[in-house]
UniProtKB/Swiss-Prot annotation:
InterPro entries found in the cross-reference section: eFR1_2_sf, eRF1_1_Pelota, eRF1_3, Pelota/DOM34_N, Pelota_arc, Ribosomal_eL30-like_sf, Transl-rel_pelota
Protein name: Protein pelota homolog
Lineage, top ranks: Archaea, Thermoproteota, Thermoprotei, Sulfolobales, Sulfolobaceae
Pfam families according to UniProt: eRF1_1, eRF1_3
Top-level taxon in the UniProt lineage: Archaea
EC identifiers of the protein: 3.1.-.-
């Protein structure tokens, strides 16, 4: 996500959507009564026939729909402004927001939690290496905000009958270079891909790093372009975030089992802990942010209190492996820095 403009006084923010997670964040942040401006298409009567016309409209939000692992957010609402000649003001409409689109959001009041969530999403960048390997060549690339940086693009000794260990030696050479970059750049995860079995041999020498293995047609720049066109990088980023949520939940369950007093759950307990500045991590199921307006406002107030006192809020989607555990503990559960009772 990229913030293109933000006018705090007018409550207007313009955003560029870069990935699926951005759409999910907007699904959480957009509330009934907010206004959005975006490009859309609509069927308009033109004499005896109807045509789908592209246009820019301003919509007052009624509700939003988002399905995990899709690339579209549906924003339902009432048209506040549109080209006069079409006569559609006051009509119901749905804006389909996709990756690559821009949207202007206007709110009467931006909560600190909402602004921080968007800023964190803008800054979020998983440190990953893309490593493409084949028996005779390899390529190592670093995805960055400003584009892809090629770190290494090299040939390997061709396997032959006289030198039986060439394949294993080549695999060690690649693995050592990957590990060297991983250490110097603070890499968190490696995506290893290639056209044949050589990637599995290389993976045997990369045991101490988080590794994803995929197939690609070649270990060249065209293979790199092939990988970049897929959804796998977004999926890895999402998996990494889900892994973090899972670790927090494991710590919560450990503390509950030991009765340490370092866990709070339920609205009243968590609210009290937040007011004391005791909340380190807060897990909230997404249902609580799409329930009735009064409850949503209560939950958001707690979330904002946590953020204001340097705690971290993680929203747990329905497809998360810890969703049902969190839901069974009221859907709102906090790991505390210190006991308050």
């Amino acid at each position: 996500m990229k913030i293109l403009e933000f006018d705090d006084k007018k409550g207007i923010m313009k955003l560029h959507i870069e990935n699926e997670d951005d759409l999910w964040i907007l699904h959480i942040i957009l509330k009934k009564g907010d206004r959005v401006v975006a490009k859309t298409t609509r069927d308009v009567s033109m004499g005896r026939e109807s045509r789908r016309i592209p246009m820019i409209i301003k919509l007052q939000v009624e509700y939003t729909e988002f399905q995990s692992f899709t690339s579209r957010l549906r924003i339902h609402g009432i048209i506040l402004d549109a080209p006069e000649r079409f006569g559609i003001k006051g009509s119901h409409h749905t804006i389909n927001l996709d990756i690559g689109d821009e949207i202007v959001i206007e709110k009467d009041h931006w909560n600190k939690f909402e602004i921080e969530k968007i800023k964190r999403q803008e800054e979020k960048h998983l440190k990953m290496l893309i490593v493409l390997v084949d028996f005779d060549e390899y390529l190592i690339a670093l995805p960055m905000k400003q584009g892809i940086r090629i770190l290494a693009e090299k040939s390997l000794r061709t396997p032959n009958k006289e030198e039986e260990n060439i394949i294993e030696d080549n695999a060690k050479e690649v693995a050592n270079e990957v590990l060297s970059y991983a250490e110097s750049l603070g890499i968190e995860v490696v995506l290893l891909a290639g056209p044949g079995p050589f990637k599995e041999i290389v993976s045997n020498f990369l045991k101490n790093i988080k590794l994803y293995v995929d197939s690609v047609s070649s270990a060249t720049r065209s293979g790199l372009n092939e990988i970049l066109k897929r959804d796998i990088i977004d999926q890895i980023s999402r998996d990494y975030e889900i892994s973090e949520e899972t670790k927090i939940m494991e710590k919560i369950m450990e503390n509950l089992a030991k009765n340490t007093g370092l866990v709070a759950y339920g609205k009243e307990e968590v609210k009290k802990s937040a007011e004391y500045g005791a909340v380190d991590k807060l897990l909230v199921i997404e249902d609580l942010l799409s329930s009735d307006e009064e409850e949503r406002m209560e939950i958001e107030k707690i979330m904002e209190e946590v953020e204001n006192k340097n705690g971290r809020v993680l929203i747990v989607p329905k497809d998360s492996p810890i969703y049902y555990e969190v839901r069974n503990l009221t859907g709102l559960i906090a790991l505390l820095r210190f006991r308050i009772n």
